[in-house]
């Protein structure tokens, strides 16, 4: 749609969870953006929103977490679980909320005669994020996951997803929803647990298989290392119990 987009995945141990004032500072100093959009966080980030706005940024919060407090004074807050929201599907994962924001933006631009994005192309990511986040599969989430799985089976998906499935020796044509959570999810999550989540993001953003495959290989190796570390920790814990 013409926007110059960059992402920032904060280290929660260093900066805290969500849109904190420190993260607003980092976003400003690194990118100097006009607009800051949160994904899967921000519903309680009053101070962070204020700091971002003090830097001259507009803020859109997309989140799905429950709250009993007043929402931050951002330019827009998109959350089916915010107080007073009548959106019927309360079980949306963060990726689902972001998808509906994009769908509505695309529809608005199309009706205004402006260029818009075909949002169906993102359903593979929506399905992956919904299932891997263990969101409740209510009626709406089942539709989103089913649509995304069908696109992956037809090879209408990110090159990164295709690369991960190839490395895991999974045939996309026979993909099951469970594979999103038990084949793709662990490999992507291993990046954040062992190194940095950027590897997983770059894999999913890769424009072609040639770019995605080396990143998918890194993710697969990190997942192997994660499993080894977890197994060792389990053995050490059991050893302590038997002493």
Q: Predicted regions span which residues?
A:
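Hydrophobic helix-and-loop "lid/oligomerization" segment in the mid-to-C-terminal part
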Residues: 1-35, 55, 73, 107-243
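Short, well-structured alpha-helical patches and their helix-loop capping segments
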Residues: 44, 86-94, 120-123, 140
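Catalytic-loop motifs flanking and including active-site residues across diverse enzymes
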Residues: 93-101, 124, 180
């Amino acid at each position: 749609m013409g926007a110059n987009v960059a992402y920032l995945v904060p280290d929660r141990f260093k900066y805290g969870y969500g849109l904190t004032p420190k993260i607003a500072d980092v976003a400003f100093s690194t990118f100097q953006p006009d607009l800051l959009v949160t994904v899967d966080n921000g519903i309680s980030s009053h101070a962070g929103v204020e700091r971002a706005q003090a830097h001259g940024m507009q803020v859109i919060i997309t989140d799905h977490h429950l709250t009993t407090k007043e929402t931050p004074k951002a330019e827009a807050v998109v959350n089916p679980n915010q107080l007073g929201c009548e959106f019927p599907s309360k079980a949306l994962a963060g990726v689902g909320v972001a998808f509906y924001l994009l769908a509505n933006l695309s529809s608005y631009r199309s009706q205004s005669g402006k260029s818009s994005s075909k949002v169906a192309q993102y359903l593979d990511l929506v399905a992956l994020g919904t299932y891997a986040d263990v969101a409740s599969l209510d009626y709406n989430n089942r539709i989103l996951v089913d649509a995304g799985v069908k696109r992956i089976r037809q090879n209408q998906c990110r090159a990164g997803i295709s690369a991960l499935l190839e490395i895991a020796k999974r045939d996309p044509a026979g993909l099951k929803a469970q594979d999103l959570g038990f084949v793709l999810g662990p490999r992507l999550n291993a990046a954040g647990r062992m190194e940095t989540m950027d590897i997983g993001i770059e894999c999913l953003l890769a424009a072609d298989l040639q770019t995605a495959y080396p990143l998918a290989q890194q993710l697969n190796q990190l997942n192997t290392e994660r499993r080894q570390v977890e197994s060792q920790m389990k053995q050490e814990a059991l050893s302590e119990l038997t002493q």
